[in-house]
Curated annotation (Swiss-Prot):
Protein name: Ribonuclease HII
GO cellular component: cytoplasm; ribonuclease H2 complex
Single GO MF annotation: manganese ion binding
Organism the protein comes from: Bradyrhizobium diazoefficiens (strain JCM 10833 / BCRC 13528 / IAM 13628 / NBRC 14792 / USDA 110)
Xref: PANTHER family: RIBONUCLEASE H2 SUBUNIT A, RIBONUCLEASE HII
Basic and acidic residues bias: start-end ranges: 1-20
Region (Disordered): 1-23
């Protein structure tokens, strides 16, 4: 009987394929900012937003100019970090970098659409920076209409360190806002799901109807509004007027020297 030795090859190759799938993602780096610094272009800002997908709450955009000599250790795409890690890095970023935040309310999102509202907030965040940047990196496909050069980077929050820092600031700020909204709108669980369309949120919508903080263009919200008609529309309170984050400096911040390479 002749054995086919090639039949064993897939088994030998299998561990290699598994290793490729389990490989850790490359962390965001400061290389693009460093390249601009070498060309004499500074300050350089990164900006990103949080909250494009939820059924409720605002879109929060952040812009960050990192200090090349004081970069906190551990900055990365906010989606790769735990809530605890994001909170700690938020404080360190605000203590060492120039930071600004802008918020697009649900009313603006309904009026302008989610893309335009997001771009509006991103531009306002850049304009609100304490120092005007000479170059801006923005996450996504769309460049901003800024006074300086703007470079859109797809997946930028996992590539460009300044964008990653902005993603952390935007995410933490929005999460805190949603926890505050939970106090005004009990029963919806905003503090848990942050406005996303999880089953618990959809159930609350069906039982209680939408609030002024829900985005009407989403089908579940529109359906809940129709069910609970006639709907008494309360005056919309602009809870999101602030465009800048107040920062509190920390005495000691761990610096990531490797990020400066």
């Amino acid at each position: 009987m002749i054995r086919d030795k090639s039949a064993k090859r897939p088994a030998k190759d299998a561990p290699k394929k598994a290793a490729v799938k389990e490989a850790a993602p490359v962390k965001a780096s400061f290389r693009r900012e460093r390249a601009l610094i070498k060309r004499g272009i500074w300050p350089v800002a990164g900006c990103d937003e949080a909250g494009r997908g939820p059924l409720a709450g605002p879109v929060v955009a952040a812009a960050v100019i990192l200090d090349p000599d004081r970069i906190p250790r551990g900055i990365d795409d906010s989606k790769r970090l735990t809530a605890e890690q994001r909170e700690k890095l938020f404080d360190k970023i605000c203590a060492t970098a120039q930071v600004s935040v802008a918020v697009a309310s649900p009313a603006r999102i309904d009026r302008d659409n989610i893309l335009r509202a997001s771009l509006w907030a991103l531009k306002r965040a850049v304009v609100a920076l304490p120092e005007a940047p000479r170059h801006v990196f923005v996450d996504g496909r769309d460049r901003l209409d800024t006074a300086c050069d703007c470079e859109a980077v797809i997946g930028g929050d996992g590539i460009v360190l300044s964008i990653a820092a902005a993603s952390i600031v935007a995410k933490v700020t929005r999460d805190r806002l949603m926890c505050a909204l939970a106090q005004d709108c009990p029963g919806y669980g905003f503090e848990q799901h942050k406005g996303y369309g999880v089953p618990e949120h959809l159930d609350a919508l069906n039982r209680l109807g939408p609030t002024v903080h829900h985005r009407s263009f989403f089908a579940p919200v529109a359906a809940a509004r129709a069910k609970h008609m006639p709907w008494t529309v309360e005056p919309v309170r602009d809870l999101f007027a602030a465009t800048e984050v107040e920062v509190q400096l920390e005495a000691s911040v761990e610096i990531d020297a490797s990020a400066n390479l």
